[in-house]
């Protein structure tokens, strides 16, 4: 019977009609059509109770359904055609489409089950049920759902793994539903860089979930390392991806590489863990030998000693470790650089007005540390300029300069701000510096200039040691010019060198010098003096403790070398901070910013008493072997004596 406010649907239900024994009535046919519409959208219901759960009527509504009558009678229904057979699924070809998704498979199966009893959709009078009553929207029954709707519906029901299988670039937040086929597809795209950059590869392989592990395993299958040594395989692998990210992520990528290498070469190493240990050791060795670290480089003996007992409790073959060390030392490991990052770097280098002149090439005059980039200041004061002859005595970390780069070269020096520029031509204010002149420039922050009393081949020579422990020899035209250069370099370094960074906290026993900031200090002159004096006391105290701790002990080999390096460092820092503090005290006493006044005050008080380094305080780690006395031929003593005679003040 009719009720007000009931669910309505334009299904023809003529008065006096009743269900026929020969077939279903109009209500049944139309209800099946509605159900088929929902099945086409991927939704199935087993009974009418399912609809009641979706659209529960209000307390005033009747639990019965009523249907409105259309103005025209229904069209006659022909016999339903036989359902079309399901098309066989094609094998995976590496590409994805909507037809491959589970939505199509489920829809075809349901149509095959219900197709025998449903009328063709194009013969129905295009009924549509009310969205207000059922809470569901249905597409017209006379047409297939549009492709955009199919993609949207399927994406909403698929999990992340299935979306990856369809070609999405999304990754899983966890590996609970990792799918091998999806991992294979993603690995293939990563290897071919299909929609990915080289920087993206390591990020996908380095995640700690099951799906990323599957992807990494499939990705490494594209590499065949059979017959290669470990360093050769590592070079091939690192050229295909930019090894970026956090330490744990990079370690996972190297673990996948080690697993693949051991699979290809099971006889080369004893275990997969051994391959991983040796791979990480090669990466650390590469950083130690070719990185910007400060301190002594790792030797072959150190490399072998560090790996003792790490090959599943045993030792790696000694000849293998020697060969690997030699390979990394002769040719450093290089991995791919992301093209976008490279273009960004090149665009920065091409900036016509760079704020920082970065040293991008090596050489005797260039810095090897990124902390020592030169920052020229256009308005910086010029403290001194004049003729100088330069010789490179030691490269960074006091490494011996190659023989072909030790020659004396004439320059015109300009001490401008905290930078000593070396030009081929005389100083001209306002003239732009060439690339070669910038390359030869030397930053004097935390530097110390001292008289080269142990160098007898040329007169009027002084040492200059920089913050990264490069050592230069400079010859001035006269004794007065030499003393002036020493004083002005040290005064400028004392005024502008910022306090050093706090020492790093580490369990490493190996001695390494701390990094020194290249930026100018922000302290006042009085605060700068107190800082230098505090560092002087600290260095003196640490030097006494170091000597007392090793008094009477005879160290050998590596331990003795480290003790000597630390003692030399502490002695030099004590001399440097003592010089800085004394010169600033003289400057404050002179009450003048002119360096001529400071030089005059030092000349009156005596340079040694006022803090200038005494002649014996040479900054070289070891005596220069070329300065040792040698056997001379008869008649050469006079010439040698003339060259070693220093003019008296």
Swiss-Prot record:
Disordered, as annotated region: 1-22, 57-161, 601-649
Compositional bias annotation for Polar residues: 618-630
Domain of life (superkingdom): Eukaryota
Coiled-coil regions listed: 523-549, 581-608
Domain PH span(s) in chain numbering: 381-494
Gene expressing this chain: Psd
Subcellular location(s) per record: Cell membrane; Cell projection, Ruffle membrane; Cleavage furrow
Compositional bias per record (Pro residues), positions renumbered to this chain: 70-88
Its job: Guanine nucleotide exchange factor for ARF6. Induces cytoskeletal remodeling.
Pfam families: PH_9 (PF15410), Sec7 (PF01369)
Positions of post-translational Phosphoserine modification: 345
Species in which this protein is naturally found: Rattus norvegicus
The keyword Endoplasmic reticulum is assigned to this record: no
Designated name of the protein: PH and SEC7 domain-containing protein 1
GO cellular component: cleavage furrow; dendritic spine; glutamatergic synapse; postsynaptic density; postsynaptic density, intracellular component; ruffle membrane
Protein's GO biological process: guanine transport; maintenance of postsynaptic density structure; neuron differentiation; neuron projection development; regulation of ARF protein signal transduction; regulation of postsynapse assembly
Ranges for domain SEC7: 137-331
InterPro entries linked to this entry: PH-like_dom_sf, PH_9, PH_dom-spectrin-type, PH_domain, Sec7_C_sf, Sec7_dom, Sec7_dom_sf
Subunit structure: Interacts with ACTN1. Interacts (ARF6-bound form) with KCNK1; does not interact with KCNK1 in the absence of ARF6.
GO MF term set: guanine nucleotide transmembrane transporter activity; guanyl-nucleotide exchange factor activity; phospholipid binding
């Amino acid at each position: 019977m009719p009720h007000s406010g009931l669910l309505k649907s334009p299904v023809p239900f003529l008065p006096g009609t009743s269900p026929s024994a020969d077939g279903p009535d109009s209500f049944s046919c139309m209800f099946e059509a509605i159900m088929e519409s929902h099945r086409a959208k991927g939704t199935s219901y087993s009974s009418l109770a399912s609809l009641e759960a979706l659209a529960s009527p209000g307390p005033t509504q009747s639990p019965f359904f009523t249907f409105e009558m259309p103005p025209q009678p229904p069209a006659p229904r022909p016999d339903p055609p036989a359902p079309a057979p399901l098309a066989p699924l094609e094998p995976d070809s590496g590409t994805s489409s909507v037809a491959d998704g589970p939505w199509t498979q489920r829809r075809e199966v349901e149509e095959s089950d219900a197709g025998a009893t449903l009328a063709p959709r194009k013969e129905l009078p295009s009924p549509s049920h009310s969205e207000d009553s059922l809470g569901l929207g249905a597409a017209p029954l006379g047409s297939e759902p549009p492709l955009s709707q199919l993609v949207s519906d399927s994406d909403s029901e698929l999990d992340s793994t299935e979306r990856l299988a369809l070609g999405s670039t999304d990754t899983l937040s966890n590996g609970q539903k990792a799918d091998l086929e999806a991992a294979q597809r993603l690995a293939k795209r990563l290897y071919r860089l299909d929609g990915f950059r080289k920087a993206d590869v390591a990020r996908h392989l380095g995640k700690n979930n099951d799906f990323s592990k599957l992807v990494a395993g499939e990705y490494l299958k594209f590499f065949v390392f059979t017959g290669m040594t470990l360093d050769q395989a590592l070079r091939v692998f690192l050229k295909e991806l930019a090894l970026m990210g956090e330490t744990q992520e990079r370690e996972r990528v190297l673990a996948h590489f080690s697993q693949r290498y051991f699979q290809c070469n099971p006889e080369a190493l004893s275990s997969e863990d051994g391959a991983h240990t040796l791979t990480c050791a090669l990466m650390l060795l590469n950083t130690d030998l070719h990185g910007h670290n400060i301190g002594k480089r790792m030797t072959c003996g150190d490399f072998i000693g560090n790996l003792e007992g790490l090959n599943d409790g045993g030792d790696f073959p000694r000849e293998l470790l020697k060969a690997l060390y030699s390979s990394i030392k002769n040719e450093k490991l290089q991995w791919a650089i992301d093209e976008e990052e490279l273009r960004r770097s090149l665009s920065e280098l091409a900036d016509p007005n760079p704020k920082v002149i970065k040293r991008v090439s090596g050489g005797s005059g260039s810095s090897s540390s990124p902390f020592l980039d030169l920052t020229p200041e256009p308005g910086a004061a010029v403290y001194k300029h004049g003729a100088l002859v330069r010789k490179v005595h030691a490269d960074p970390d006091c490494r011996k300069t190659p023989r072909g780069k030790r020659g004396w070269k004439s320059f015109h020096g300009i001490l401008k701000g905290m930078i000593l520029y070396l030009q081929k031509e005389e100083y001209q204010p306002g003239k732009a510096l060439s690339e070669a002149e910038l390359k030869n420039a030397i930053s004097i922050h935390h530097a110390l200039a001292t008289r080269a009393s142990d160098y007898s081949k040329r007169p009027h020579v002084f040492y200059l040691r920089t913050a990264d422990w490069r050592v230069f020899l400079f010859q001035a035209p006269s004794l007065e010019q030499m003393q002036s250069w020493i004083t002005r370099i040290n005064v400028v370094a004392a005024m502008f060198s910022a306090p050093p960074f706090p020492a790093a906290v580490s369990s490493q026993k190996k001695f390494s010098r701390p990094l020194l900031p290249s930026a100018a200090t922000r302290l006042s002159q009085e605060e700068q003096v107190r800082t230098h004096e505090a560092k002087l006391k600290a260095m003196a105290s640490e030097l006494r403790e170091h000597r007392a701790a090793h008094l009477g002990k005879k160290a050998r080999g590596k331990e003795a070398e480290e003790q000597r390096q630390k003692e030399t460092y502490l002695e030099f820092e004590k001399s440097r901070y003592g010089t800085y503090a004394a010169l600033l005290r003289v400057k404050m006493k002179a009450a003048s910013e002119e360096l001529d006044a400071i030089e005059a005050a030092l000349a009156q008080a005596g340079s040694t008493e006022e803090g200038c380094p005494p002649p014996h305080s040479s900054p070289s780690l070891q005596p220069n072997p070329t300065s040792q006395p040698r056997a001379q031929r008869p008649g050469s003593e006079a010439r040698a004596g003339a060259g070693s005679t220093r003019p008296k003040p």
